[in-house]
Regions:
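Short, low-complexity N-terminal intrinsically disordered segments enriched in polar/charged residues
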Residues: 20-65, 103, 151-155
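Surface-exposed, charged secondary-structure patches
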Residues: 82-123
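Short beta-strand edge/turn micro-motifs at domain boundaries
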Residues: 123-152
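Bacterial N-terminal signal peptides
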Residues: 5-15
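A mature extracytoplasmic/lumenal domain signature
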Residues: 62, 72-73, 97-99, 104, ...
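Short solvent-exposed beta->alpha transition segments
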Residues: 56-94
Length: 155
């Protein structure tokens, strides 16, 4: 009867020792295509224009038929979005984990996470749909999704 526990202990020890001796490879970031980089740059420039309250740049970047969905599930239109952007962005806003999903050669969804200190919800997952119109990227659709683990945060 003592052989089974002893054999189990030896197997576990050998497995752990083998696992520790394996060289670990650092996770290399996926290469970013020129298309993806263009959209990431476009998204960053758009956010910068909002932060710096460059209203003409923001107005030109939002499509005439823009629609959005807020964290409460309500739709908002271009005029409501532009009135919000004219307030600017908090200085300590943080955007991270930007990903681009190519739909066609002229459209893509840019997703990212955003932390907005002092806002409710503070932690959001954003999805912006961009389409080229006359050679320029235009924001066609935006959806805010609260991260559920932070939906009831209080500052």
């Amino acid at each position: 009867m003592r052989t089974i526990p002893m054999l189990s202990a030896v197997l576990i020890s050998a497995t752990l020792a083998f696992a520790q001796n394996q060289p670990s490879k650092p996770l290399a970031p996926s290469p970013v295509s020129a298309f993806e980089q263009e959209l990431v740059n476009n998204q960053n420039q758009f956010m910068q224009a909002i932060a710096e309250q460059k209203h003409a740049v923001v107005n030109e970047s939002v499509a005439a038929d823009f629609q959005g969905i807020g964290t409460n599930g309500d739709f908002y239109d271009r005029d409501e979005f532009l009135s919000f952007t004219h307030e600017g962005l908090p200085k300590d806003l943080r955007v991270y984990e930007i990903h681009v999903v190519r739909l066609t050669d002229d459209s893509a969804v840019v997703t990212y996470n955003m932390i907005v200190p002092g806002a409710r919800p503070r932690y959001r997952h954003m999805s912006d749909t961009w389409a080229k119109d006359g050679g320029k990227w235009k924001l066609k659709f935006q959806q805010y999704t609260p991260n559920l683990w932070s939906a009831n945060d209080f500052d």
